[in-house]
């Protein structure tokens, strides 16, 4: 099984790291081992302590003194051996603890550098290679090298097509049978694929028709969107069916209210009654005397002479002429007064109605008389 360069570098780095971690532990564990304590001088060290204990009475010394000597000798030997071993182990441990981290960090940096160089070389090699255009990835940009390769293939296919045409020639009916239709189809398919890829490579950076249509300014002869996008509504029916506006009665500030009109009418009637009262008085002294007599005497006595005088046709004619002369003057004065009052007060009553009203009111006293 052949390993690639990346796999080899990774394997070597793993081995180095494993060794850098395991070797210091081995060295440190070996330094911790202590050497056996040295035996005391004489033959006492060859025998076990029980033998010393049994042989003690043979000498001329007491057993307590011998036990103390042997104990001191062993303690001295242990202290001496442990002191020397500890000093050597401590110095070795400190040196390895300083070297190993630096060594491991340097190895790690070296591995990273190798991986970086390999990745960079791989990318440059991939740029130099020629890849065929995949049918699914149509929007991929084509490099200049790929474009040159496609142009060469296009030239080769054109040369092959020219050779086929030359073979056919004028007597091509017999030679055309030698060339199969499959080869022609294959060549045509290759030619179409190459031309398609070249067009995609040339026009890939251009805008799409949709973007060009969006960014293009509106021309003067642009007629707008078709009718399907925005329907045209006929508003004639709505205008015909629209109901007429209803005006709400709002009082005109210039017009008088009903109460004010009633008050003015009452005042006008009072003034008219006053005028009629003054005008109804007769100017003839006879009439004044008659009125005074009638006013003084509620029940006057009727005599035959007065009755005959009233029924006299001459008297009646004089009275009729006097009344006819006085009526035009009264009518003119009342007409002017009525027209002036109604103009000032804004009433819509015509002067003819006022004239007829005055005539009726003026003739009533005459009828009563």
UniProtKB/Swiss-Prot annotation:
- This protein is called what? Protein RIC-3
Where does this protein have coiled-coil stretches?
A: 140-169
Q: Which domain of life is it from?
A: Eukaryota
Q: What is known of its domains?
A: The coiled-coil domain mediates transient homodimerization with other acetylcholine receptor-bound RIC3 molecules, promoting stepwise ACHR homomeric assembly at the membrane.
Q: Which organism is it from?
A: Homo sapiens (Human)
Cross-link Glycyl lysine isopeptide (Lys-Gly) (interchain with G-Cter in ubiquitin): where in chain: 202
Question: Which key words tag this protein in UniProt?
Answer: Acetylation, Chaperone, Coiled coil, Endoplasmic reticulum, Golgi apparatus, Isopeptide bond, Membrane, Signal, Transmembrane, Transmembrane helix, Ubl conjugation
**Could you tell me the gene encoding this protein?**
RIC3
Give ranges for the Lumenal compartment.
29-95
């Amino acid at each position: 099984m052949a390993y690639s360069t990346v796999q080899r570098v990774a394997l070597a780095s793993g081995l180095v790291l494993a060794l850098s971690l395991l070797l210091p532990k081995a060295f440190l564990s070996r330094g911790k081992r202590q050497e056996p304590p040295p035996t005391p001088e004489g033959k006492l060290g060859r025998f076990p302590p029980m033998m010393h204990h049994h042989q003690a009475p043979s000498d001329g010394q007491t057993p307590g003194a011998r036990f103390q000597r042997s104990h001191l000798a062993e303690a001295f030997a242990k202290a001496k051996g442990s002191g020397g071993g500890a000093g050597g182990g401590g110095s070795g441990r400190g040196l390895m603890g300083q070297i190993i981290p630096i060594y491991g960090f340097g190895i790690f940096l070296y591995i990273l550098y190798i991986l970086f160089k390999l990745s960079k070389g791989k990318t440059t090699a991939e740029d130099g290679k020629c890849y065929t255009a995949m049918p699914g990835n149509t929007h991929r940009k084509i490099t200049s090298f790929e474009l040159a390769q496609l142009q060469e293939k296009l030239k080769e296919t054109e040369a092959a097509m020219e050779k086929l045409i030359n073979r056919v020639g004028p007597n091509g009916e017999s030679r055309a049978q030698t060339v199969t239709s499959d080869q022609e189809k294959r060549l045509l398919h290759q030619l179409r694929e190459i031309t398609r890829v070249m067009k995609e490579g040339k026009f890939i950076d251009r805008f799409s028709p949709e973007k060009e249509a969006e960014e293009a300014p509106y021309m003067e002869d642009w007629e707008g969107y078709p009718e399907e996008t925005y329907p045209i509504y006929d508003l004639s029916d709505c205008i015909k069916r629209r109901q007429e506006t209803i005006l709400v009665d709002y009082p005109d500030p210039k017009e008088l209210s009903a109460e004010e009109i009633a008050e003015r009418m009452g005042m006008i009637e009072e003034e008219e009654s006053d005028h009629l009262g003054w005008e109804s008085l007769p100017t003839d002294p006879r009439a004044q005397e008659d009125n005074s007599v009638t006013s003084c005497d509620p029940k006057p006595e009727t005599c035959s002479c007065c009755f005959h005088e009233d029924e006299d046709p001459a008297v009646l004619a004089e009275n009729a002429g006097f009344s006819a002369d006085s009526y035009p003057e009264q009518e003119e004065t009342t007409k002017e007064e009525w027209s002036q009052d109604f103009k000032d007060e804004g009433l819509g009553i015509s002067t003819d109605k006022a004239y007829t009203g005055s005539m009726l009111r003026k003739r009533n006293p005459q009828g009563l008389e």
